[in-house]
From Swiss-Prot:
Keyword Kinase: no
Designated gene of the protein: fadI
Pathway: Lipid metabolism; fatty acid beta-oxidation
GO CC terms: cytosol
InterPro entries referenced in this protein's UniProt entry, alphabetically: Ac-CoA_C-AcTrfase_FadI (IPR012806), Thiolase (IPR002155), Thiolase-like (IPR016039), Thiolase_acyl_enz_int_AS (IPR020615), Thiolase_AS (IPR020610), Thiolase_C (IPR020617), Thiolase_CS (IPR020613), Thiolase_N (IPR020616)
Main function: Catalyzes the final step of fatty acid oxidation in which acetyl-CoA is released and the CoA ester of a fatty acid two carbons shorter is formed.
Gene3D superfamilies from the UniProt entry: 3.40.47.10
Matches recorded under SUPFAM superfamilies: Thiolase-like (SSF53901)
Compartment(s) of residence: Cytoplasm
Species lineage: Bacteria, Pseudomonadati, Pseudomonadota, Gammaproteobacteria, Enterobacterales
Assembly: Heterotetramer of two alpha chains (FadJ) and two beta chains (FadI).
List of catalytic residues: 99 (acyl-thioester intermediate), 392 (proton acceptor), 422 (proton acceptor)
Protein name stated in the entry: 3-ketoacyl-CoA thiolase
Catalytic activity: an acyl-CoA + acetyl-CoA = a 3-oxoacyl-CoA + CoA
Record's keyword annotation contains Lipid metabolism: yes
Length: 436
């Protein structure tokens, strides 16, 4: 094993995760219909600061992400600073790493802390699948630009006369990979076939996710980390995630038809995560700064790793690539972990990554390692359910996972937790967190 790379500042401080908070996650076009991601981000950051009693001027940097960006406000981070009463001098910039966006935001703030340029910062992400940048066709877009340059009315009319009715149709955001044309669900189908994952296995994992998430809410385990959200038209609050199937049976999952490969597929809407609206954020500080303010950190960031693989085949294997690297940098093995939380983009993707982590052959032939990362103990895995149940506002999921894992590790007496995710573009992310 390579030498561990401790995440500490120049003064020897650990990177403390002081607190975290999220909105409830809502299925597309439900409770947050019409609420843009910026407003969701302002909602969660404002509430988190109010709950923590941390003066806004203590926060020196805010790094936030949004995957489905709105052209009228390309820097969501700065808009959150300006819209929550924080100091106008607070540094703020936005990041995007697809489904691992808030992992990246956390890493960026951690690096600023280690460099000594700040002592406290906020990281997070927000996305809305209900407020989308609906565009225009390329033909219409080019015509509008040319018309803006035209000098006479006749020149403009000539340009517009070339348009056809189809050119006037709205264009929704792309759901396929730009480089390959493959949808995420197509890749999930690839992985199900490559790794021999059956429809029954996928449905069972999805059912487990919903059962455990419902149980977590029933037992009050999530109440401290999920705010009550009031969204226009303010008729009723949203207190819990509204995607969780509390009373479903395994037989219910078997009724759905494949969503991507209609003839031979096994990936359905029920064993995939849905389009979701929501926001999540965490406050990070140097350990000494937290002590100065009299704060008990929720936990600490021990290590992180980002990886990238080919996009044409099984590109959602990011966790299988990034996990061994994050463990190595933390000086740990899979057996040392108290909990493991893997983003469930699809049940097929999740099960494929679990197979790869346990495979000596994958370790040798693909990763160039001598042995497998290890077989994941089910009793440690996604113990409160996962993204299939909670939903997946792309940029918010990582911050949700970090906060949720740290709370649960602390409830279990402390230890280490792994949070890991795949992302579009063949990207992967993994972080080791620690709670005492």
């Amino acid at each position: 094993m390579s030498q561990a790379l401790p995440l500490i500042t120049r003064q020897g401080d650990r990177i403390a995760i002081v607190t975290g908070l999220r909105t409830p996650f809502a299925r597309q076009a439900t409770a947050f219909h019409g609420v843009p991601a910026i407003d969701l981000g302002k909602m969660v950051v404002g509430e988190m600061l109010a709950r923590s009693d941390i003066p806004a001027e203590v926060i020196e940097q805010l790094v936030f992400g949004q995957v489905v960006q709105m052209p009228e406000a390309p820097n969501i981070a700065r808009e959150i600073v300006l819209g929550t009463g924080m100091s106008v001098h607070t540094d703020a910039y936005s990041v995007s790493r697809a489904c691992a966006t808030s992992f990246q935001a956390v890493a960026n703030v951690a690096e600023s802390l280690m460099a000594g340029t700040i002592r406290a910062g906020i990281a997070g992400g927000a996305d809305s699948s209900s407020v989308l940048p609906i565009g225009v066709s390329k033909t219409l877009a080019r015509t509008l630009v040319d018309a803006n340059k035209a000098r006479t009315l006749s020149q403009k009319l000539k340009l517009f006369s070339r348009l056809r009715p189809r050119d006037l149709l709205p264009v929704p955001p792309a759901v396929a990979e730009y480089s390959t044309g493959l949808r995420m669900g197509d890749t999930a189908e690839q992985m199900a076939k490559s790794w021999g994952i059956s429809r029954e296995q996928q449905d069972a994992l999805a059912h487990r996710s919903h059962q455990l998430a419902a149980k977590a809410w029933e037992e009050g385990k999530l109440s401290a980390e999920v705010m009550t959200a009031y969204a226009p038209p303010f008729r009723e609050p949203l207190e819990q995630d509204n995607n969780i199937r509390k009373n479903s049976t395994l037989a219910d999952y078997q009724k759905l038809r494949p969503a991507f490969d209609r003839k031979h597929g096994t990936v359905t809407a029920a064993n995939s995560t849905p389009l979701t609206d929501g926001a999540a954020a965490v406050i990070l500080m140097t350990e000494s700064r937290a002590k100065e303010l009299g704060l008990r950190p929720l936990g600490y960031l021990r290590s992180y790793a980002f990886t990238a693989i080919d996009v044409w085949q099984d590109m959602l294997l990011g966790p299988a690539w990034s996990t061994p690297l994050a463990l190595e940098r933390a000086g740990l093995t899979l057996a040392d972990l108290t909990l493991i939380d893997m983003h469930e983009a699809f049940a097929a993707q999740t099960l494929a990554n679990l197979q790869c982590l346990a495979s000596d052959r994958f370790a040798r032939e693909v990763l160039g390692r001598s042995q497998a990362t290890g077989e994941v103990d089910e009793s440690k895995f996604n113990v409160l359910g996962g993204s299939i149940a909670y939903g997946h506002p792309f940029a918010a999921t990582g911050a949700r996972m970090i906060t949720q894992t740290l709370h649960e590790v602390r409830r279990r007496g402390g230890g280490f937790g792994l949070v890991t995710a795949c992302a579009a573009g063949g990207l992967g992310a993994a972080m080791i967190v620690e709670a005492e």
